[in-house]
Amino acid sequence: LFSRRLMDAAGGPERMEYNGSQDYELFLRLTEKARKIVHIPHALYYWRSSPGSTASDISAKTYCIDAGIAALKAHYARCGVAVDDVSLIPGTPGYYKTDYTIDHPGRVSILIPTCDHIRDLETCVESIYARTTYPDLEIILIENNSKAPETFRAYERMQKEHPDTLKVVTWEGKGFNYSALNNFGEKFATGEYLLLLNNDTEVITAAWLEEMVMYAQQKRVGCVGAKLLYPDDTIQHAGVGFGIGGVAGHLHKYFPATSDGYMGRLNYVQDVYADTAACLLIRKEIYDEVGGLDESYAVAFNDVDFCVRVREAGHTNVFTPFAQLYHYESKSRGLDESPAKRKRFESEVKRFQQRWAKQLAAGDPCLNPNFDLMKEDFTFDIKPLE
C-alpha cells in the first residue's frame, strides 16, 4: 500500500519496458522517495499461486529475470551506487546478487587470538594465504599463554614465511578473555578494516574478503558476518537472531550447507541484528567509536553485545552467504561444561539481559514476531490478531 502522491513523486505507475518485473521496478522507485518502509507483521490475507505463475516460480517466465536485473541496475544508477555486476542467484529465482564496486581495497587486519592447538592455527593461516584473493591484508596472531614449544617454533616459521604480513603479539593477561585479546591485538592493526577471526577456522571461498569488504565499506554498514560451516557441512552461523532463547541464537543452525533456508535466506545477503565474532569484519573507525569489545564478557555474548552497540550507534549489521569458512567450533577452548564455566555463562546471560532489556522487549526487526523464539529454525508461532 502506498499513496498516489508517493507514486507521482517516484515517476508514475509501472513501466512496461520492465514487463514481468514491472511491480518490482515500481517498488524500487518508491523506496527511493519514501521516508520509511513499514511492514505489518501479521497474516492479513493468503495468496494463492497457480502453476506456471511467477508467484510460484519466476523461472517459468525467464524474461522476468532479465527485467528484474535491468530494473535493479537502473535503481543503482539513479542512486549513484557503483556496481560491477548484478546477477541471478543460482537456485533462488527472484533473488539477485549485487557485486558492489570496492572503491578502495583498504587493508584488512586479521586478528586471531591463539593458545597452543597449533595444528588448528596452521590450518587457518595456511588457508588464508593459499586461498584468499583480496590484495591487501595482514595477520596479527595474539599469543595467549601458550606452553608447547612447537607453538613458538611455528610462530617463528610463519613470520619467516610471511615477514611483511604476519606478526605475533603477546597478551600478558591470564586465562581466556576473547574481548581483551582482540582489544589488545587491535592496537597493533594498521588496516582500515578489522577482521576478528577464530583460530579454529578454515577459508573455503577465495573471494571471502571481497564479499565482506564490499558491504563493510558502505557508510550505513557496521558488522559483516560470514557463512560458517561445521566440518560435517552443516550451518554453524548464518546471522544471529536477537531474543532467541531469551538472549540470542544462530539462525538456521545445523541446516545442511546446501539448504536454501527459510524463504531462501541462506542464499542472499541480508541485514541481521548481530553476527558471531568467530568471523566478523568491521571498519576500524567504528570499532574504536563504540569502544571495542566489552571485556566484562570474557567468552559468551561479547560479539552480540558489540553488535547491539554498533546498531545503537546508527549502523546496520549484515550477513553474507558468499563468504564461507569452516569453523571447528570450541575445539581450542573446550565446551562450557564445568560448573565454573556454567556459572560464568549464566552470569553473562543475566548481565546481557539486564543491559539490553529495552532492546530485547522491542524484538528483532529482522525477524517476524510470528517465529518461535525458543528455536533457531524459523518454526512458526502464529499469534492471533486481537
Model-flagged regions — what are they?
Residues 61-108, 222, 232, 244-271, ...:
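C-terminal, non-catalytic tails of nucleotide-sugar-dependent glycosyltransferases
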Residues 129-174:
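Acidic donor-binding segment of Leloir-type glycosyltransferases
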Residues 1-73, 282, 292-297:
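Conserved nucleotide-sugar donor-binding catalytic segment
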Residues 201-247:
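Conserved donor NDP-sugar-binding/catalytic core segment of glycosyltransferases
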Residues 1-5, 17-19, 177-180, 187, ...:
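A recurrent flexible, glycine/aromatic-enriched loop bordering the glycosyltransferase active site
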Residues 194:
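Short aromatic/hydrophobic "clamp" motif used to bind/position activated sugar donors
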Residues 18, 28-47, 70-89, 287, ...:
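Catalytic donor-sugar/metal-binding loop of nucleotide-sugar-dependent glycosyltransferases
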Residues 117-132:
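Short, well-formed alpha-helical segments that are part of the catalytic scaffolds
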